[in-house]
């Protein structure tokens, strides 16, 4: 087995563990917390969880997939859809397309952060050389 593939398999344990945690949490019935706090907490949890899941998948797939961020978003989106379907079987929970949209916000933030990171490094490289990254020399 290729060392890069082996490393990617080991790195994939982190996002798989997070997927297990998301599955466990989504299997919990609705709590008796004040509805507004529960809604805010769940939505923030959706954004944060899927932001982290997308980042972990991109990290796990780096060096193996041609476009690790795109593949990470696709995996995360598919999991968000399947998790919402899973919630339709949990008492007191509902699976909604709105929640998939909220999950997608986390995925979009992760993709933006991953896209922005190389740009920031490139800008610093040009600053160190005393040039502007927008001007061609």
Predicted regions: what they are:
Residues 15-26, 69-87:
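Small-polar-interrupted transmembrane alpha-helices in polytopic inner-membrane proteins
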Residues 7-13, 32, 64-71, 96-97:
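Membrane-helix interface segments
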Residues 3-4, 60-67, 116-124:
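Membrane-interface junctions at the ends of membrane-embedded or membrane-associated helices
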Residues 122-137:
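Short, intrinsically disordered terminal tails adjacent to the first/last structured region
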Residues 32-39, 81-104:
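Interfacial helix-loop-helix junctions of multi-pass membrane proteins
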Residues 49-63, 105-118:
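Membrane-interfacial alpha-helical segments at the cytosolic side of multi-pass membrane proteins
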Residues 42-54, 76-87, 95:
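Short, conserved structural micro-motifs that define repeat-unit consensus positions
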Residues 1-58:
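"…centered on the first transmembrane helix and the immediately adjacent amphipathic helix/loop
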């Amino acid at each position: 087995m290729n060392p890069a593939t082996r490393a990617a398999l080991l790195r994939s344990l982190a996002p798989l563990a997070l997927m297990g945690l998301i599955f466990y949490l989504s299997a919990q019935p609705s709590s008796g917390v004040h509805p507004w706090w529960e809604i805010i907490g769940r939505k923030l949890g959706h954004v944060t969880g899927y932001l982290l899941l997308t980042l972990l998948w991109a990290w796990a797939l780096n060096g193996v997939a041609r476009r690790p961020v795109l593949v990470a978003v696709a995996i995360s989106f598919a999991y968000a859809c399947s998790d919402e379907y899973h919630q339709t079987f949990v008492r007191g929970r509902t699976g909604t397309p709105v929640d998939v949209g909220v999950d997608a916000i986390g995925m979009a933030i992760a993709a933006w952060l991953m896209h922005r990171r190389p740009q920031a490094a490139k800008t610093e490289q040009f600053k160190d050389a005393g040039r502007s990254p927008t001007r061609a020399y």
